[in-house]
A protein has these predicted regions:
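Glycine-rich helix-loop-beta junction characteristic of Rossmann-like nucleotide cofactor-binding loops
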Residues: 33-39, 103-104, 142-143
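S-adenosyl-L-methionine
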Residues: 71-119
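Conserved SAM-binding loop of SAM-dependent methyltransferases across substrates and taxa
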Residues: 51-64
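A short glycine-rich, Lys/Arg-flanked "PGG" loop and its adjoining helix->strand segment in the class I
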Residues: 130-146
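Class I SAM-dependent methyltransferase Rossmann-like catalytic core
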Residues: 1-40
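Short glycine-dipeptide loop
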Residues: 64-65, 144-149
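Class I S-adenosyl-L-methionine
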Residues: 154, 158-213
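Conserved class I S-adenosyl-L-methionine
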Residues: 40-50
Length: 213
């Protein structure tokens, strides 16, 4: 068995044994072990939630006083008292308003493990993933609180550095991480974005409006 296959099999078996919906749960667990971003009482929005591995982990960490909203076009299989599911397309022009209506207040944490169907064409998959991520970033001024945190999945490629530069305008720190639970051969990376500055974003939006007049 190849090393990457062995790792995938290990986490699949571990997920089944420990009662997690998917092996992807361990990616978020490992990210949280490093950054301690999920805490009791937090409000979380998780994009690309199906089947529910990340929601399950987030739900455990935020507890009964927290809230987790999962957003996906597919059915989300996990349910709990502190979890709601929104079956929707992120390109729906009204989705940020819909999400806002679901949330008790602006989110502390935004998670994105979303991806489209993989074509196997490296550049094509990379650019599609960047577009998805940019779409989610566009929601931040509407749904994320000041000093919030985001974790965003991207695929390696030429646009990653540009995206990080853009994110650093609104976040104090942006780091690239590949959790051990990710397959060795996978091109996926996670951008961990810490300490969101909503005032900077609002200022930039104002400047953009002025420039278009």
């Amino acid at each position: 068995m190849k090393l990457s296959d062995a790792k995938r099999d290990f986490y699949r078996k571990k997920a089944k044994k420990q009662g997690y919906i998917s092996r992807a749960a361990y990616k978020l667990i490992q990210l949280n072990q490093k950054y301690k971003i999920l805490n009791n009482g937090d409000i979380v929005v998780d994009f690309g939630s199906a089947p529910g591995g990340w929601i399950q982990v987030a739900s455990d960490y935020v507890g009964s006083s927290g809230f987790v909203l999962g957003v996906d076009q597919r059915e989300i299989k996990y349910d709990n008292k502190n979890v709601k599911s929104l079956i929707s397309d992120i390109y729906d022009p009204e989705i940020h308003n819909t999400i806002t209506n679901y949330l008790p207040k602006k989110a502390d944490i935004i998670l994105s493990d979303i991806s489209q169907n993989i074509s196997g064409i490296w550049d094509l998959d990379h650019f599609k993933q960047i577009d998805l991520t940019k779409r989610i970033i566009s929601f931040f001024p509407h749904i994320m609180r000041n000093r919030g945190t985001a974790i965003l999945k991207v695929f390696t490629g030429v646009e990653v550095d540009k995206l990080i530069s853009r994110l650093k305008i609104g976040f104090k720190k942006v780091e690239i991480v590949k959790p051990h639970a990710s397959r060795s051969k996978s091109s996926e990376l996670y951008l961990v974005c810490l300490n969101y500055n909503s005032k900077v974003i609002e200022y930039l939006k104002m400047i953009e409006v002025e420039e278009t007049k």
